[in-house]
């Protein structure tokens, strides 16, 4: 038996789902590098787009169930961690997705089966294929199984850049992304002081100073988060 065909069968057994639509599964596992332009090949890029949304829904649903008292701003960073490229690639390795992928010879030769971007994209495509083949329940079952260990990791208290934290908080509140504006620059060229204002729709802006624009922006973001009780 062809090694890749065997790997596809092993993958189905590991995730606990036998695909009715074999072409759909094959497309989910086919990277865009396949095909030389003359031969049209249906790759997994569109499924990857759909799967990103399916995965986001399942992750949001699971987080809301696990942390019913958490606020949106508290759930947002966990959600971002669960659907990140790093996490999706790690899940792909756990499911041994790499050997089942269909890649071009050149991509395979340079280690494409172990590349985070390829593995993460294929994971999203697989979630879309599960949704289309077996409905949301089939996708949910696989998600809860493969991502089970990721929930604790997503909740680890890793230090975050204040600007990133503010962006996640704003998204969790359903607000537009923060905007930054330099209000003033004082001091000599060798020791400048920047005054920066950060604004988020619906709340008062925060102002802070720093020795560089970046430092001032971080300080302003931190000030706004702390004032809103999210820092």
UniProtKB/Swiss-Prot annotation:
Enzyme class at the top of the EC tree: hydrolase
Molecular function (Gene Ontology), one example: ribonuclease III activity
Catalytic activity: Endonucleolytic cleavage to 5'-phosphomonoester
Binding site for Mg(2+): 48, 124
Pfam families from the UniProt entry: dsrm, Ribonucleas_3_3
List of catalytic residues: 52, 124
InterPro entries assigned to the protein according to its UniProt record, in alphabetical order: dsRBD_dom (IPR014720), RNase_III (IPR011907), RNase_III_dom (IPR000999), RNase_III_sf (IPR036389)
Keywords: Cytoplasm, Endonuclease, Hydrolase, Magnesium, Metal-binding, mRNA processing, Nuclease, RNA-binding, rRNA processing, rRNA-binding, tRNA processing
Cofactor dependency: Mg(2+)
A biological-process GO annotation: regulation of gene expression
Family annotation (HAMAP family): RNase_III (MF_00104)
Entry protein name: Ribonuclease 3
Gene name per UniProt: rnc
């Amino acid at each position: 038996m062809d090694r890749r065909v065997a790997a596809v069968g092993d993958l189905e057994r590991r995730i606990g789902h036998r695909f009715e639509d074999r072409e759909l599964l094959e497309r989910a596992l086919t990277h865009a590098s396949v095909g030389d332009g003359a031969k049209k090949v249906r790759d997994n890029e569109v499924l990857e787009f759909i799967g990103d949304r399916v995965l986001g829904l399942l992750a949001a649903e699971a987080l809301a169930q696990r942390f019913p008292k958490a606020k949106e701003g508290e759930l947002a960073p966990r959600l971002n961690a669960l659907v990140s490229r790093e996490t999706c690639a790690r899940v792909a390795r756990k499911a041994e997705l790499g050997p089942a992928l269909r890649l071009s010879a050149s991509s395979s030769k340079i280690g494409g089966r172990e590349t985070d971007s390829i593995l993460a994209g294929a994971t999203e495509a697989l979630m879309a294929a599960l949704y289309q083949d077996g409905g949301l329940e089939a996708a949910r079952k696989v998600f809860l199984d493969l991502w089970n260990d990721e929930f604790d990791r997503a909740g680890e208290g890793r230090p975050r850049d204040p600007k990133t934290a503010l962006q996640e908080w704003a998204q969790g509140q359903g607000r537009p992304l923060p905007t930054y504006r330099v209000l003033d620059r004082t001091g000599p060229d060798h020791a400048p002081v920047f005054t920066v204002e950060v604004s988020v729709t619906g709340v008062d802006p925060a102002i802070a100073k720093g020795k560089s624009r970046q430092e001032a922006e971080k300080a302003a973001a931190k000030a706004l988060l702390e004032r809103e009780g999210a820092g």
